[in-house]
Amino acid sequence: MIDLTGKTSLITGASGGIGGAIARLLHKLGSHVIISGSNEEKLQSLGKVVKDNYTIEVCNLADKEECRNLISKASKLDILVCNAGITSDTLAIRMKDEDFDKVIDINLKANFILNREAIKKMIQNRYGRIINISSIVGISGNPGQANYCASKAGLIGMTKSLSYEVATRGITVNTVAPGFIKSDMTDKLNEKQREAIVQKIPLGTYGMPEDVAHAVAFLASDQASYITGQTIHVNGGMLMV
């Protein structure tokens, strides 16, 4: 049984489906959760669900100073889950420089800053668990998402580099790469679109946010102390690497 009692976890993008599921599970396993996102109303709603042992931190990841402050405000930090991300999809020949830049800035650069600042804090205690949420398309690519795919592939490379740098300090750094997970976005697909995607998934169904949360919880636990620099794929077999 995973026990995170006494641990403090920071989850970005906690106002979304996957982030919320991660926050709820880590809280259930005993961790104090710092739930962060840009939508305060949704964070307050999540707070009502977990009820206690939580802190809300509204943060705009496009503001690098806010990224740094998000970490510095945590008096204690054992687990960092970088889940927040954005998309701005279009074919590369139509993609504006600013559309590429804003996705890289939030999905990759902001997460680098969060990782870096968290490591500074974790080194003091010689303990830490960092889990960066990538995506299946960071490995496979996807048409119309050159910016998003680049950012998610970058997270995987960054994670590997950081894991080397901090391995002797009791800190592990890993990535979880979800496939097609049920969300507001997938709910908007029509039946034909859903069937086309499901046909590509050997397990024959979408994943649930909780599937991703369980992978994160394992990597955040002491049971995963010998795992670092790895990418855990949660995609129903859609991509086997």
From Swiss-Prot:
Check the record and name the InterPro entries matching this protein: 3oxo_ACP_reduc, NAD(P)-bd_dom_sf, Sc_DH/Rdtase_CS, SDR, SDR_fam
Which Gene3D superfamilies does this UniProt record tie to the protein? NAD(P)-binding Rossmann-like Domain
Pfam families noted in UniProt: adh_short_C2
Which residues are recorded as binding substrate?
A: 135
Residue positions annotated to bind NADP(+) are 13-16, 38, 57-58, 83, 148-152, 181
Q: In which pathway does it act?
A: Lipid metabolism; fatty acid biosynthesis
**An annotated Gene Ontology molecular function:** NAD binding
- Active-site positions on this chain: 148
GO process annotations (BP) = fatty acid elongation
- According to its UniProt record, the EC number is 1.1.1.100
Q: Which PROSITE patterns match?
A: ADH_SHORT
Alphabetic keyword roster: Fatty acid biosynthesis, Fatty acid metabolism, Lipid biosynthesis, Lipid metabolism, NADP, Oxidoreductase
Q: Which family does it belong to?
A: Belongs to the short-chain dehydrogenases/reductases (SDR) family.
UniProt subunit comment: Homotetramer.
PANTHER family linked = 3-OXOACYL-(ACYL-CARRIER-PROTEIN) REDUCTASE, 3-OXOACYL-[ACYL-CARRIER-PROTEIN] REDUCTASE FABG
What does the protein in this record do?
Catalyzes the NADPH-dependent reduction of beta-ketoacyl-ACP substrates to beta-hydroxyacyl-ACP products, the first reductive step in the elongation cycle of fatty acid biosynthesis.
Q: What is this protein called?
A: 3-oxoacyl-[acyl-carrier-protein] reductase FabG
Q: What is the lineage of its organism?
A: Bacteria, Pseudomonadati, Pseudomonadota, Alphaproteobacteria, Rickettsiales
